[in-house]
Amino acid sequence: MYNQKSSMTVRYEINPPKISDDGQDVRNVLFERIETISSVCNGIHLTDSVLGIPRVSPFEIAKQIRESDKNIKLTCSLRVRDKNLNDIEKIVEQSVGTVDGILVLMGDKSDAMSSKVELIPSQVVKTLNDNGLGK
C-alpha cells in the first residue's frame, strides 16, 4: 500500500482576479469566497493565468491568505511560458514559508504576451531541485 495514512489534503482551486478586473471590490469577493471555502476544506490551490488570461499573481494572493490563515494548505500553479528562469527562481525563493507546494506547468498561450523562448517545465523543476528550492 502506498500511503498508510487514512487522510489527505482536499484542495479547492481558485482563479485570482483578472488583472483587467482587479480592484478592491473584486478582491473582497475573492477573500470572502476563500474564507467560506477554508471552512469546508483544508487546502486551496491558486491558478496562474488560466487560458493565458493575465491575472493577479497567485503568489501575491497566497501571501495575503497566509497573513490571515496560518493553517490552511496553499499551493500555486507557476506558468513557465511567460517567465525566465531567474524570475521563476525569485518567485520560488520568495514563496518559501508562504506556500506548501508549487505546480510547475507550461501554461496556456496568451494573446497579451509576446512569445518568449519557452522553458520546458521538467527542466525548470530539475533546476529548482538542483538549486535546493524543491526540498
Mark where each language-model region is.
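Active-site beta->alpha loop and helix N-cap motifs at the rims of alpha/beta catalytic domains
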Residues: 2-135
